[in-house]
């Protein structure tokens, strides 16, 4: 009787091995599920990015508002009869190096 129980236990273990550790086992399925979740998350991020880019393209094609905004912020352009005011942070050091103008020596009289 003991021999039969041991044989049955061994058979159960042999049957369970491919279920858990085999090519199509539960561990592999779990790993693939994690990969699918990561891919879906990345796809959602890319869809959001594409939607944002598509709306920007539509704005540039149809209206002048987006073009005007880009001209203002990226190129520093202003409209006619507009006053440009720039507020600087007093605590932030300027990244520009000021160079004094060159000295001009007076011409000699002849």
Swiss-Prot record:
**Short name of one Pfam family:** DivIC
Superkingdom per UniProt: Bacteria
Q: State the coiled-coil residue ranges.
A: 31-64
Q: Which residue stretches are annotated as topological domain Periplasmic?
A: 22-110
What ranges are annotated Cytoplasmic (topological domains)?
1-3
Cell cycle as a keyword of this entry, yes or no, is: yes
Q: Is the keyword Metal-binding in the record?
A: no
- Where in the cell is the protein located? Cell inner membrane
Ordered alphabetically, the record's keywords are:
Cell cycle, Cell division, Cell inner membrane, Cell membrane, Coiled coil, Membrane, Transmembrane, Transmembrane helix
User: Which InterPro entries does the record associate with it?
Assistant: Cell_div_FtsB, FtsL/DivIC
| GO BP field | FtsZ-dependent cytokinesis
Q: How does it sit in the membrane?
A: Single-pass type II membrane protein
Membrane-traversing stretches: 4-21
Cellular component (GO) terms are: cell division site; cell septum; plasma membrane
HAMAP family, per this entry?
Answer: FtsB
| Described purpose of this protein according to its UniProt entry | Essential cell division protein. May link together the upstream cell division proteins, which are predominantly cytoplasmic, with the downstream cell division proteins, which are predominantly periplasmic.
Q: Oligomeric state and partners? A: Part of a complex composed of FtsB, FtsL and FtsQ.
Q: Which family does it belong to?
A: Belongs to the FtsB family.
Name this polypeptide is given: Cell division protein FtsB
The organism's taxonomy opens as: Bacteria, Pseudomonadati, Pseudomonadota, Betaproteobacteria, Burkholderiales
């Amino acid at each position: 009787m003991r021999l039969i129980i041991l044989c049955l236990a061994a058979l159960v273990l042999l049957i369970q091995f491919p279920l858990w550790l085999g090519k199509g086992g539960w561990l592999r399925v779990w790993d693939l599920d994690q990969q699918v979740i990561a891919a879906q998350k990345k796809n959602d991020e890319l869809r959001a990015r594409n939607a944002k880019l598509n709306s920007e393209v539509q704005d540039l094609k149809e209206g002048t508002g987006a073009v005007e905004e880009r001209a203002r912020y990226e190129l520093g352009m202003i409209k006619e009869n507009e006053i440009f005011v720039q507020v600087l942070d007093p605590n932030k050091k300027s990244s520009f190096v000021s160079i004094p103008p060159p000295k001009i020596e007076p011409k000699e009289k002849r």
